[in-house]
Regions:
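Tandem amphipathic alpha-helical repeat scaffolds
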Residues: 27-34, 61-73, 97-111, 135-150, ...
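N-terminal leader/linker segments that initiate helical-solenoid repeat arrays
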Residues: 24-63
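Terminal, low-structured helical/coil segments at or just beyond the last alpha-helical repeat
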Residues: 279-306
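Bacterial N-terminal signal peptides
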Residues: 12-22
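Bacterial N-terminal signal peptides that target proteins for export
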Residues: 1-13
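Residue signature of alpha-solenoid helical repeat architecture, marking inter-repeat boundaries
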Residues: 55, 94, 134, 170-173, ...
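Amphipathic alpha-helical segments of tetratricopeptide repeats
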Residues: 49-50, 82-89, 122-128, 132, ...
Length: 306
């Protein structure tokens, strides 16, 4: 049993928000996004559409399509992208890459992952050749979502390498989440000693963004890796500190409770672990994703919690 957090959900919102929040995007179309409200984003993009021409207009149109994909209106998203497609023959690299990304994202969200993969790969190739490093990193981040496994891990590594050396603000904004994914790929392969410095790098990168919740989750990941390395006292110290920080913020984190329980149990303190197993079960039992995806894990927490 791996005892990890659902990383695909952990950083998705922060990943998107970090793009929009970057100061470098003051005049960039990414700054018009409000990912939690696709309808509001559509209104912003339609207003912007009246102010731009040429390639910029095509880019905006791809983002309007994305607002429909996020609302799971895939047919409308594809219709809007169909309108863009014939205009790409004379367009520059940026609208072509954005078109490929949004077509791919629409297929992926609709469950057609096989159709999405070649589009993301082509987006990576075009963006890389054109020096559009932010869009290239975006493409590299999307491929693992549709392929997984060793191939997905390799694409994450490519994205990390490019983002690390890039001076592009969009690419740099993606680095924390990519580092998180890269670290978990190493961890999942049992390469704990290699994963630990990457987890630490991700923590530093998240804290640099000022996003405290994501910073705490990154520290949790460091501690989780320390547990895998058998460094229980260090891991427990971090989880105890996180417990206090979440409490000070008026929140409870079931994953922190779970780790404290596991660490106390691993160090021969089952009586101290029991109430933390119970708290973990109570908190994580409120999470619909956890209940659906981790039934055996939840059952174990409840059993150990008494």
């Amino acid at each position: 049993m791996r005892f990890v957090r659902p990383r695909s959900r952990l950083f998705a919102a922060a990943f998107a928000a970090s793009l929009a929040a970057s100061p470098a995007f003051a005049m960039d179309i990414d700054s018009y996004w409000e990912y939690a409200d696709p309808a509001a984003s559509e209104a912003r993009f339609r207003s912007l559409l009246e102010q731009v021409r040429g390639d910029a207009r095509l880019e905006v149109q791809t983002q309007i399509a994305r607002t429909f994909s996020l609302r799971r209106d895939f047919a409308q998203a594809h219709r809007l992208l169909d309108e863009v497609e014939p205009q790409l023959a004379t367009a520059g690299a940026a609208p072509r890459v954005r078109y490929l990304l949004e077509r791919g994202r629409t297929f992926n969200s609709a469950g057609e992952k096989d159709r999405a993969r070649p589009l993301f790969v082509e987006a990576w190739e075009i963006a890389g050749a054109a020096g559009l490093e932010g869009l290239a990193v975006d493409a590299a981040h999307m491929v693992p979502i549709v392929v997984g496994g060793a191939e997905g891990a390799e694409w994450t590594r490519r994205g990390v390498e490019l983002a690390r050396r890039s001076t592009d603000a969009k690419a740099r904004a993606m680095l924390p989440a990519l580092l998180n994914n890269h670290a978990w790929n190493l961890h999942d392969e049992g390469r704990y000693a290699e994963a630990l410095p990457v987890f630490r790098e991700a923590e530093v990168a998240w804290l640099a963004t000022g996003r405290q919740p994501q910073g705490r989750i990154a520290r949790w990941s460091v501690a989780r890796c320390l547990r895998s390395l058998g460094r229980y006292d260090e891991a427990l110290g971090i989880q105890r500190a996180l417990e206090q920080e979440w409490a000070a913020a008026g929140q409870a984190d079931g994953y922190v409770y779970e780790e404290i329980a596991e660490l106390l149990d691993a160090t021969g303190k089952p009586d101290q672990a029991q109430p933390y197993f119970r708290r973990a079960a109570d908190e994580l039992g409120k999470d619909a994703w956890f209940v659906e995806k981790e039934p055996r894990r939840l059952a174990r927490l409840r059993s150990r919690g008494g």
